[in-house]
Regions:
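Bacterial N-terminal signal peptides
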Residues: 10-20
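Bacterial N-terminal signal peptides that target proteins for export
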Residues: 1-12
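Charged, low-complexity surface segments at secondary-structure and domain boundaries
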Residues: 1, 15-17, 33
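Subset of outer-membrane beta-barrel
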Residues: 25-353
Length: 353
């Protein structure tokens, strides 16, 4: 009992420290480089796009929480592909290395390309096509403190270009994780993407902050059943997640459409917009199935008369020989969703013994 109290006290100290770090970065929920909030690997996409606590053999897990690095991920590498909405395509490469039993390093490179876009001048006349893309490098260090605690720090240079315009920014992540392997219990806290854009697309634009976010999550596996559940609270730094849209009287646009009082979000609805629920079905060591529900995604992408499976996501992973293959599909809107594919392996598994 004494050990449990010490662990809880230690985690609260770390949590308050991270929250204080995040609180200096105002303008919650806004900011530039919004692609940094996207799930760039299949495991994360299958768990609803938001998770900072799940412990697995997936090397990509430290992307959302640098404290999820561990010695078990030593020399693992992964490549991911994302087919996003509106013909946008992206990907991520990940690598981790354990310096020793206490110190771990990780690296992510991610990009999002938006294809060829139609160009127009200020008068609406068509010009040449142009391209746009976003890139980020995520450099991660984590240290095991003992008593089941790990803390981590990530630095991420960001580059973005639209046509002939470009910008550069620098962001940081800070995370903490408490993990009891014998309980299959994990608690994670992550302050993500706090930082600034230093060079602008054009001179008069001004400096803007990155889309910072504080997330906290709990993951617990059942002792006598192959299920592991996760609950993630998204945007601890911002209660109001009300993406407002006009209520349409019909499917046609009208100048008379206005927002109505019934669009006000009730307390319970707002609370659930912060929560992402996920479950993993662990079938042996070589296969798993994931499913999640993201209520905010369900509400924001819904049509007035149709929501369907909006907000649900599904994923599966299979180990074949020395490779792990994961795939996920996330439903965003009635007309479509996203597909993510990840392939990972351990470099050590190919070394001759």
């Amino acid at each position: 009992m004494c050990m449990i109290r010490v662990c809880i006290k230690s985690f609260l100290i770390v949590a308050l420290t991270l929250l204080s770090i995040g609180s200096v970065n105002a303008n919650a929920g806004g900011g530039v480089y919004r692609f940094l909030n996207l799930p760039f690997n299949a495991k994360l996409a299958g768990l609803g796009g938001e998770n900072v606590s799940v412990q697995s053999d997936d090397v990509n897990q430290f992307y959302t929480n640098p404290a999820l690095l561990s010695s078990s991920l030593n020399s693992k590498i992964s490549l991911s592909y994302v087919n996003y909405l509106a013909d946008a395509n992206g990907g991520m490469a990940s690598y981790s290395y354990a310096l020793d039993s206490l110190n771990y390093f990780g690296f992510n490179f991610l990009f999002m390309g938006y294809g060829d876009l139609d160009g127009y001048d200020r008068y609406g006349n068509e010009t040449e096509e142009f391209s746009a893309g976003d890139f980020a490098w995520n450099l991660v260090y984590a240290r095991y403190l003992g008593a089941n605690f790990t803390v981590g720090l990530a630095m991420k240079p960001v580059y973005s270009h639209i046509e002939s315009y470009s910008s550069f920014g620098l962001g940081f992540d800070v995370g903490a994780n408490y993990y009891r392997k014998d309980w299959d219990f994990s608690v994670g806290l992550s302050v993500r993407n706090f930082g600034f854009r230093f060079t602008d697309y054009y001179d008069e634009q001004g400096t803007e902050r990155l889309p910072w976010n504080i997330q906290m999550g709990i993951t617990k596996g059942l002792e006598h059943a192959p299920f592991r559940f996760s609950v993630t609270y998204d945007h601890l730094n911002d209660w109001s997640l009300d993406y407002k849209r006009p209520e349409k009287s019909n499917s046609l646009l009208s100048l008379e459409d206005t927002e109505k009082d019934q669009n006000e979000i009730k307390f319970a609805d707002m609370l659930f917009r912060h929560l992402v629920f996920g479950v993993e079905v662990l079938i042996g060591k070589n296969f798993h199935f994931d499913m999640a529900y993201n209520h905010r995604r369900n509400r924001e992408y819904a049509l007035s008369q149709a929501r369907g499976m909006n907000g649900f996501s599904f994923g599966a992973g299979l180990k074949v020989y020395k490779f792990n293959l994961d795939a996920a599909y996330a439903k965003y809107a009635p007309s479509g969703g996203t597909f993510t594919l990840s392939l990972s392996s351990s470099i050590d598994s190919f070394k001759k013994k």
